[in-house]
């Protein structure tokens, strides 16, 4: 935008992106980060600036900001505890809209070796969550029946319906973002979810 002589403060831009992000997380369709920038331009009355640079900006985003995003504080300890207790661990995550990008990011995570199976919904399956197929596929890859699986998620709009729809127990971790839904259990953190699992 600077090249076009248009200047906005980074604070205002990030505030708008945050609101767009929350809205997109509340929907039940493929989360394409390119839409971030297109929506932002539309809100700023700058739709005429759309072009190839939008996707280039998305790629830059993943290489910088998202690449440096920290895990939740209890992620590693939770995974280690569950692994030690004999749980078989897998992950279901929606595609970012850029083929291969989500898996590339997952491969960089320190917990990768603890996962026995990974499903990128929207790439390994035709539909993203809450479609049931990503959930049945992760169970298949783990060699388990869905009713013998527990799904821990933090987005009520995408995680509850799909997991419970195939017969999995569903634990929802309360985070910022969309509210609602009817999980089997509600947890304040991954650590709390672990305690629930140990009890059941």
Which residues does each predicted region cover?
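Asp-based, Mg2+/Mn2+-dependent phosphohydrolase catalytic module
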Residues: 8, 49, 76, 80-83, ...
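N-terminal helical cap/lid subdomain that shapes the substrate entry/recognition surface
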Residues: 1-80, 84-85
